Amino acid sequence: TSSVQTEENVILVTPTYAWRIPHIVSGWLGKAELVGAKRIWFVMDCGSEIGNAAKYNQELAAQKALTYMGTAQIVMPENYIALFPAPDKQEAKAIVENAKPAIRSIIDCIRNGMEFPAPRNNLYDRFMSGAVNPIFYKKIVKADAFTVSDACIGCRKCVQLCPLNNIRLDKDKPVWGANCTHCMACICYCPKETSVYKGYKQDKIEMRGDRAEMSDFPLYLNTVAGGLDRRDQTIGGFSFVVKIYAVPVVEIIG
């Protein structure tokens, strides 16, 4: 259990894993003590959709005795190459550009202390976040399909970035354990592009390292993977709890 000193307003920014917030994030939030918190907004970036994640976020808020202020989604370039194709660099940049209006609306809601509009919630959404999510984790979120080529230099980058300490070196080559959350940081940040998942290499993620910055409102789009990189910030009466486990991630920082 961890304790985080916050203002009354908390914004949780997180990727979408299997149409809900990552289990590792919900587990952390369930155990963490948010000292001073009264209201919470959830901001989720995704490759296409968040399903019925709002239902489970609302349950988390109730568990924490926080006023639930809604869940918002921001579509970012797909990076989950275990199942889906990643866009090329130009397409990825266009997706980021197209997300700006939604991001502005999200920021306006937060600034004005308003609830987010209710997201879509149809039968498909409920099915994906409900029935599919646990099956997805059980059947797909595994590390046994990760391999590395002979070009690996044993730099330990993947070991250092893994948020779950699931990678170790054996004879200067990475070995994946069983505790994997499929953040893909080991692939996206391999300096020699040697990490492979079922034949997909790092070059499938062409937005790696690119950043899109906007100065007309307090936002920073970060498409850089960071492994476990939790940042707790208090800015202007709002506390931003950012959980980064994958690329790309959206950070609101001001």
Question: Which residues are covered by each model-predicted region?
Answer:
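A mid-sequence, solvent-exposed acidic-amphipathic segment
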Residues: L123-R156, Q160-L161
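Short low-complexity, flexible loop/linker segments enriched in glycine and/or proline
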Residues: V4, F84-A86, C183-I187, I205, ...
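Iron-sulfur cluster-binding cysteine motifs and their immediate structural context
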Residues: V148, I153-T181, A185-Q202
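FMN-binding flavodoxin-like domain, especially the glycine-rich phosphate-binding loop
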Residues: T1, T6-T14, A18-I135, K139, ...
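Long, positively charged, glycine-interspersed low-complexity recognition regions
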Residues: E193-R231, G254
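Short, highly charged low-complexity linear segments
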Residues: V75-E78, Q160-D172, M214-V224
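Conserved short-loop catalytic and cofactor-binding motifs
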Residues: V13, D45, E91, S149-D150, ...
